[in-house]
Amino acid sequence: MESNNTMSYDGDKSSDSMDDILNASDNDYCDKDSIPARSDLTFKNGYYVNVTAIFIDIVGSSDMTDEHKRPTLAKMYRAFLSECVAIMNAEIDCKEININGDCVWGVFDTPYKSDIDNVISVAARLNSMIKILNYKLRKKNYSEI
């Protein structure tokens, strides 16, 4: 969710909102074949959808600061992040991509088994990309990711 900074926080309203959500009918949730449009998602409704998520990050990235300075680290992170995003973004079933630090995650709309199989192929492409990137990093005497 993108921040819009258009409202101030009110603790009393927040408490009421929590009560509204927790006391809502269990019938306020419906099954959907695909992920609903963002405009259809509110804090007052809910959907059951079949999705698959991929999370990929740089293991031990905090230790990389011991070996490399900022320009090198920035290049390593950018190469990793940009290619992860590119691979996921190439898939029509990928509906959401987020970057959190050195983690990239994508949410894929997977109503059918064949869609899940496709996400496994995406994971395989990500793995192959990491192997290529590590080869390139070794050639520059950088740490592998």
Please name every model-derived segment.
Residues 5-14, 29-32, 59-64, 79, ...:
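Short low-complexity stretches enriched in small and charged residues
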Residues 39-121:
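Catalytic NTP-binding/metal-coordinating core of nucleotidyl cyclase/transferase enzymes
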Residues 92-99, 130-145:
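Catalytic core regions of nucleotide second-messenger enzymes
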Residues 126:
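Serine endopeptidase catalytic core focused on the charge-relay Asp
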